[in-house]
């Protein structure tokens, strides 16, 4: 067996001491802070690209990969649900999934490019139409939020169950703090979003937050990358499940729920809900999907 490499104690002793000119520590990013001895090896960050074409292909591959992960999570339900990403070159265009293709079969080449200012299909897959309600919701969100590059929406079981309460999630555990003061509730159900007005109403309810609970409908999340938005959706779905279980447990009156305090929730939000961190969180799911099914979703 090969010997395990260990740091020499003399190395540690040779580090700058307090008061020396080089002793000031560089402030860690949230992602770096989550890794023990993070600066020993740089953690993978959101990549940059030399061309729009390279970034576009990367976005579409990760979008398709997110759908594959969602399929294993059990989020697929008929033609419901959609993910969109803003085109890196043309900021008035988004890419969205086609109508009726199962999440578990989605590929990068399936995606449709839509000008969200005009509603016209301008590229990508022209063999299958997009979901009209999806185009309405996502177009409105991208118009209203130029800072957002990806939007996710689905009718997953626990999200739509919890949405019937028409109230925000409570800070009941560490993970749900990703949404501390960063999610809202659309308190009106306006039916299938076939009109531009319903899409606009949803976008208005989203406001400046990361996510929105659509009453009697489902969940919607956003992100700087599709990875961030898709992972946030998974966190929100599980947070809805956790709260439903907790509400059922306390209904008998024998136990009480304990909320995380505002200070602690804000602290968790700062360190866990950073775009780089959430991007990194999704990568293990994508690697596992590739391990299970290969990389055909990138085609």
Report each predicted region and the residues it spans.
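N-terminal low-complexity or amphipathic/hydrophobic leaders
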Residues: 26-119
